[in-house]
Curated annotation (Swiss-Prot):
Residues 350-469, 505-640 form the C2 domain. Homodimer. Can also form heterodimers. This is Synaptotagmin-16. Residues 167-177, 287-303 have a biased composition (Polar residues). GO terms for molecular function: identical protein binding; phospholipid binding.
Amino acid sequence: MVLAMASQDVQNFFQPFSSWISRVYEALQQAGDMLSASLVNISKQDSKLSDKLDQDLDNIQIQETYFEDEEQDNDWSQEDANSLFLEVDHFSCCNSDLQDSAQNSSPSLSQHAKDSCSTMSQWPNWASDDRKLPHVLSSIAEEEHHLEKQRSGLQHGFDSQLPGTLETVNGKKQVNSFGDDEELSTSSDSDEEVIKQFEISVSRSQSFRSVTSEKGKQTGLEQKPKFSRSLLTHGEDGTEVSACEDLDGASQRRYSENLSYGEDDHIPAHSQSPCERGDAKHHGTSHQESSVVQSLRRQSTEGSLEMETAFNSRGFEDSYATDSSSMWSPEEQDRTNLQVPSGVSEPISKCGDLDVIFEYRAASQKLTVTIVRAQGLPDKDRSGVNSWQVHVVLLPGKKHRGRTNIQRGPNPVFREKVTFAKLEPRDVAACAVRFRLYAARKMTRERMMGEKLFYLSHLHPEGEMKVTLVLEPRSNISSGGSPLSPSAVSHSDSTSSTQSLSHGGAPELLVGLSYNATTGRLSVEMIKGSHFRNLAVNRAPDTYGKLFLLNSVGQEMSRCKTSIRRGQPNPVYKETFVFQVALFQLSDVTLMISVYNRRTMKRKEMIGWIALGQNSSGEEEQDHWEEMKETKGQQICRWHTLLES
């Protein structure tokens, strides 16, 4: 009974508890269903929102492309409208002219002109109305390609136009004008622009020099330029001693390959500014500016040319102080007859003139040469001698020789005859007579001062022929463009510098010395050389000189050198060097002068040397030094034979 009651109590207790549990479970299940439904709704709303956002973004992009197309269409319509406006202005101007003329002729023509003007004035409105269509319609790819092609063509036309020219692009004239030189330069200082500006300035300066040289050639004077470079002048202004820089052969050739002056007008510029189309006032202003710039450039060019011409003429007037006869050919000397003005002193290296009479008789096969007189010889103060003698030899055989007696004075008169026998008429044209003037000294050997070669091909067949020969100071007889070959005339005179002195083959140097005891300055002028030859090849050498001042024990006190003279057997230096030497040291110093041949790819080669002063290389050098000390400031010039090393 108790058990039954207990089980019934348990059932009564668990029955409501189980019902409560079931209700709780149902409530939880309903809540889960509601949550799942709400989650599904939220996911649907999110998908709708994302789709809406994507659609909005697409709409925005479509609107942007539409606006861009609209702006591009507006630009095209504006350009076409501007072109139409320009054409309307052009036609309106033309119609206004027609209207003025029509008013003078008849009223009907006047009315017709007004109608045409009004019709033209309505074109921009039509164009603007028509251009509204592309705002709605899409653009065509072919039209875009055509417009891009037109733009590239216009840009290419601008780049290809030359300065100051007019070109037509798509029916419209384009004007390119340039300003002054300052406007051509850009703001960036790059190396390329600097190099371009340098090349332009060099081409202009070279063109100025070429024009000046052409004007100098048109004067009719055949005198050639001389080397007049010097380190210091004879005055007492300079104190420093510096070596001259070597002349560059490439720079010398560059002067003969100059650009003409007309090419400066086609120099490319760094920037150009095309004028606006349809602006007639701007066109006129650009033409005026270009004409003003061209006139200013022309004035500056003419001024610089006048300055260089004046400089060249001044150098020509001063050229009488030097001698360039050794640089001329015999034909040029025969044609040239320059008169030295009175009051100008004779050049130091001038050898004078020799009057000769030729007479050939074919019957006896004899050639008689009469040496009449010599004129214009250097005086004793310059040459150091006052006695003269003429040697004559028949080339190429050198078997027939003759000489005159010694005569004294600056204008010696000889009047002596030299006869060459057994000279057949067929051999006359192949022969030549060489005249050499020697300075005769007592107890010493003769010194050759000048020479001249006369070709018998110029000889008259019968009768006498009077000729005045210009004596060249130690010139190279084989370099005058003669009809005789160098080997036929004298092989020793053209290829060797080691022959005997009787043939005049030894290299010599003309040196000027002066000393000022007050300032203690020893001035040494290396004037010119003679018979400088290149033993390696059969061509004239490239020579330069070196000067050394040595003390009593042979130590070097100072040195300097001249510039290079290229391809000259008889170079003219005319360079002066100043050494500071006290009066009490003058008898203890030695001046050594060496001449070198500069050879490519090889070491330099010494042509010869001389020494003056305490350890003189010979009696002539010692006499020259002593005479310099006695003259007290006056320059003494002497020829010296170079000693081979």
